[in-house]
Amino acid sequence: MDNRVQIFDTTLRDGEQVPGCQLNTVEKIQIAKELESLGVDVIEAGFPVSSPGDFNSVIEISKAVTWPAICALTRAVDKDIDVAADALRYAKHKRIHTGIGTSDSHIKYKFNSTHEEILERAVHAVKYARKYVEDVEFYAEDAGRTDNEYLARVVEAVIKAGATVVNIPDTTGYCLPEEYGAKIKYLFEHVDGIDKAVISTHCHNDLGMATANTFEGIRNGARQVEVTINGVGERAGNTALEEIAMILKCHKDTDLYTNINTQKIYSLSRMVSNLMNMPVQPNKAIVGRNAFSHSSGIHQDGVLKNAQTYEIIDPKDIGLDENSIVLTARSGHAALKYRLETHGVNLSEEKLDKVYEEFLKLADKKKEINDDDILMLAGSERANDHHIKVDWLQATSGIGMKPVASIGLDISGEKFEAAATGNGPVDAAIHAVRQIIKKPVTLTEFTIQGVSKGSDDTCKVHMQVEHNGRIYYGFGASTDIVNASIEAYVDALNKFTAE
C-alpha cells in the first residue's frame, strides 16, 4: 500500500458553507492558486448545480490551476452530473464527486427509499459520471452511522461500477476514533476489489474528534483525507489540513507522508481567515496566535535554553519567521507589498497606494504595525466599491452625558447627513445611519474582537442584520471601535441595497 496520503482540500466547497464566510470568484481563485503552491492533490472547487456563482467558480478555477485535480460535487442526480461535467470542461485533471446518503435515517427520512434502491442509485450515478470523466469519487453520506455490512456492499458495488475513490464521511461528527478506524478496517477486510480504489476520509468536528478520526482512518488504510484550511466548515467545521500535515511530519515513525509544503501553511491560514472574515481562535493547533506562545515562567526559561523543551514544532516549519520585517511609519511601499505578498495578498498598484495611505495613518497611531493590521487594511480596500460610503463620523460619549453621533454618507454620489442619540456611541451612530437609509433593518448579531494585543491595535467587528426576512453579514476593522462598527453596519447595508 502506498505510504503517501493524498490531500483533498474542500475549503472552497465545504469550508465556504460557514454563514457569513462566502467568497467571490476572484477570492476563490486566489485561494486555489495558493492551495496549488501548498501542494494539495485535489481542490474541490464547488457544487456547480447549486448556483451560477459556484458553476462559474469551478470554470475559472479550472482555468487558473495547473496540476491538482479539480473536483466538482454532485448529488446522485443525472442533471447534477451533467452540470458538473460542463463546469469542469477546462480542467486539466477532472474529478466528479457524486454520492448519496447510506445510513438508515437518510434512507428512511431523507429519501423515503429502500436499501436496494439507494444501492442502485449509487451505482447508476458512478456509471453516469464515468461517461464524462475517468476519475470519479463516490461519497456514502453519513457513512459514520451506516451499518458496516451494508456500507461494504455499497462500496464494493460502486468500485465495480468504476469509482476510483470512495469517500467514507463521518458527516455528523458522531464517530469515536476507534469506531471510525474500525469501520475503515472492516471495509478493507470485507470489500472485494478495494485495492482498485483509494479510500478517503471526510470527518466533521461536532464532537471535537475530526482530526483524531481522520488519523485513525489513515492508520487503517485510507490514503486520501478531505480537509480544510483552519478546519473551517459547516457547523463545528472539518478536519484541519494543517493538523494532519503536521501530525504526519512530526510522527515520522508512521512512515506516512504528504506532498504539502508545510512552510506555506501559516500564510495561507491567515489569507483564508482574512478573505473569509473568520478569525482563527488564538489557541488553535498549529496556526493559532498562541500556538508558539509561552506564558509560564518555567516554560519560558526552558524555551530560552532550548526550544525543543516545550515546542515539538519549529515555527519555521509552518512559515513563521522570527526575523520578519518590522513595519513602522518609516516603511515604504516595497516593504508593505512584500509583507502582503507573503500572506498571498496581491494588490494592483492603485489599490496598494490606497492601502499604503491607510497604513501610514495607522502607523502614526502605533509604534509597529503587525500582520493582522495590514491584512485588515487590505481587506477593507474591497469596500471601496460600495455605493454607500461613510464620508465622516463623529461620536461623543462620556460619564454623565448622553451619547451623540453625527454622520455623513455618500450614496451613489449624493451626500446625506444625520445626527442621533443612543445608549452608547455605536448605538447612536447606527441610529444616525438609519435616519438616512430609512429601510426596515434589524440588527441580529454584533461581535467585537480585538485582533492583536495592545489597546491601540485593530479590532474586528462582525454584524448580522435582517431585512425582509433575509440575513446579511457585514465586516469592519479599525483601531476605533465606533468606526469599525459603522463600517460593518454599512458593509451589511451594501449587501442588500445592491440586490
Would you name each region that the model predicts?
Residues N3-I7, Q17-V42, F55-A64, D78-I199, ...:
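Alpha/beta enzyme core
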Residues R4-V5, T11, M246, K252-A419, ...:
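A mid-to-C-terminal "edge-of-domain" accessory segment
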Residues Q17, Q30-I31, E368-Y472, G476-N483:
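Non-catalytic terminal/interface segments that mediate subunit docking, oligomerization
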Residues F47-P48, L73-A76, I100-T102, E141-A143, ...:
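Short, ordered loop/turn segments at secondary-structure junctions
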Residues W67, P169-T171, E226-E234, K249-T258, ...:
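Short beta-alpha connecting loops at secondary-structure transitions
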Residues C175, A182-K305:
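Catalytic alpha/beta core domains of metabolic enzymes, predominantly
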